[in-house]
Amino acid sequence: WQRVCEDIQAGTLQRRYRGDVSLGIPKTVPRQLLDKRQYVTAHATFATMGCRNACRFCSIAKFHESRFFTRPVADVVAEVAAFDSPFFMFVDDNLTQDRDYAMALFEGLAPLGKRWITQASLTIGDDEALLAAMQRAGCTGVFVGLETFNPDALASQQKAFNTPEKYRTAVAAFHRHGMYVEAGVMVGFDHDSPAVFRETLKSLE
C-alpha cells in the first residue's frame, strides 16, 4: 500500500499491482474495540492464507494465485494465548494444507486448552495422526467442501481429489475425533439434472 499511496501522490497510479504477501502482525489486534454482540466470536485469527488447489469455482485460487502462506507458529500461539475467551475461530482457507506446519501448530496450541473451529479439506479424513493432533489442540468443528456427489462435476471444477465414495468414512473420522462437520454443497453444475436437489439431499442423509 505504501507504493500505491506514493503513486497516487505522484500521479502515476497503475492499473494493477502485484506484491509479495507478508503475514507478520506487528502487534496484537485491539479486539476490545469490537462490539462482541455483532459477532459469532470476536476472537478470530488466521495461521495460514491461501490454498494451493485451483478449484474453478473458488475465489481464493484466483486471489492468491494458488499460493499458500504461513505465519510463524510461535506468533499464532502467542496471539491465541492472549484471547480472553476459551473459544476462537481460525478463518484460514485451508488450515491443514501444509501438514508439517499444521502438526507443529497443533502441538503448540494443545497446552492452551482452548476450543476452536476451522476450514479444512475433506482429504485429511484418512489421516488419523493429523486428526488426533487437531483434537488434542482443541478443534471441535470443521467446515469442509463436499461440493457435489457427482464425480464428473468435481472433475469439471478441478476438484477431482474429492472422491464421493469416501465422504461417509471421512466425515465419520472427524466425528470420532470429536469434531462436528459443516458441509459445503453446491448444485447447478453443467453435469447436474433437475433431480440433483433430491439426489443431493438423499446422499447427505
Task: Set out the residue ranges of the language-model regions.
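Glycine-rich beta-alpha loop elements in corrinoid/cobalamin-binding modules
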Residues: 1-25
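Radical SAM [4Fe-4S] cluster-binding motif and immediate context
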Residues: 29-182, 187-189, 198, 202
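C-terminal accessory regions of radical SAM enzymes
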Residues: 13, 195-205
